[in-house]
Every structure is written in structure tokens, then in C-alpha cells.
């Protein structure tokens, strides 16, 4: 044995498993309430928005809310649509869960040349029923602003400098 490492022992035990949710019994109640649908900030420089949705499971079985978040601009044009709870994360009975979904775009114009700055509106439409057929929507709306202030400041500075230069040349 190496005398330098004598008495030193490291062990790592790794384990993994897949959680399995089983429904037992006959009387399932699927009921949920949408407690909040908000963004992490009210003003953004670029479309890098995190939507946070809190849902409370009021039923006696687990649910997996899924849906879509549609984003519209100042002109009411839908500029993007993202999945809500794309991973289908379940919510156990009598618990609340917070779901975070991100909308990210580097541009200020959509692929269809729709404006992606100014006041924006996001609409969430989610469903959660799996056992009995039917439509049980959870809907909410939130607003936020996208203000590219660096671009605005740079443009305004350039305009002011241009005006000052033109005035000096006229004199």
C-alpha cells in the first residue's frame, strides 16, 4: 500500500430511478386552480422573458397541466407561441407547483417582420384533465414591455449629433 494515501478512502454510490405515479381507486377528482401567471420582470431590453405560472391541484389525483403561451405585440399580432410545461411535469394532489417557461429571441422583429418591442401581452391556455374527457381550461394573461434602450439611446444620440453638426455648417 502507498503510505501517502493510507487511511484515505473515497466511495461514490450513484443511483437513479424513474418516478412512477399510479392511480388507485375509482373516484378520481381532477381539479386545479391557476394562482398566478407572471413574468420575472416587467421591462426587458430584448425578448428574454421567463414566465412563471403557479397552479394548485385541488383534486385527489395527480395532474399534468400542458398548453401554450401566445405572445402578441402592441398591434395585437401574434408574434410567437411557446409550449407551457413542455416536459409534462406532474403536480401531486393537494399541492401547488411553479412552472417556468422561457421565451427567447435575439431579434426585435419576428420572422414575419412583426414588431417585437413595446407593450407585449402573453396569454396562457392550459388543460390538465386526463381521466374523464372534457375541456378544463386554465387561462391567464400578463403584460410586459420590451424596450431596447441601448438602441434608442444610440439613435437619439446620433440624431442630436447630426443636428448639431448641420447647425454648425450652416453658420
Where are the predicted features?
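Functionally constrained cores in energy, signaling, and assembly domains
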Residues: 16, 30, 101, 167-169
Amino acid at each position: 500500500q502507498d503510505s501517502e494515501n493510507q487511511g484515505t478512502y473515497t466511495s461514490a454510490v450513484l443511483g437513479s430511478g424513474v418516478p412512477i405515479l399510479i392511480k388507485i381507486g375509482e373516484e378520481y377528482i381532477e381539479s386545479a386552480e391557476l394562482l398566478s401567471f407572471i413574468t420575472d420582470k416587467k421591462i426587458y431590453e430584448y425578448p428574454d422573458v421567463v414566465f412563471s405560472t403557479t397552479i394548485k391541484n385541488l383534486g385527489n389525483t395527480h395532474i399534468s397541466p400542458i398548453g401554450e403561451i401566445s405572445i402578441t405585440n402592441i398591434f395585437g399580432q401574434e408574434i410567437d407561441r411557446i409550449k407551457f410545461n413542455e416536459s409534462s411535469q406532474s403536480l401531486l394532489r393537494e399541492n401547488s407547483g411553479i412552472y417556468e417557461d422561457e421565451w427567447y429571441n435575439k431579434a426585435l422583429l419576428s420572422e414575419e417582420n412583426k414588431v417585437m418591442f413595446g407593450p407585449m401581452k402573453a396569454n396562457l391556455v392550459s388543460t390538465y384533465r386526463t381521466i374523464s374527457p372534457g375541456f378544463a381550461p386554465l387561462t391567464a394573461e400578463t403584460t410586459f414591455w420590451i424596450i431596447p434602450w441601448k438602441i434608442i439611446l444610440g439613435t437619439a444620440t446620433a440624431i442630436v449629433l447630426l443636428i448639431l453638426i448641420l447647425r454648425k455648417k450652416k453658420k
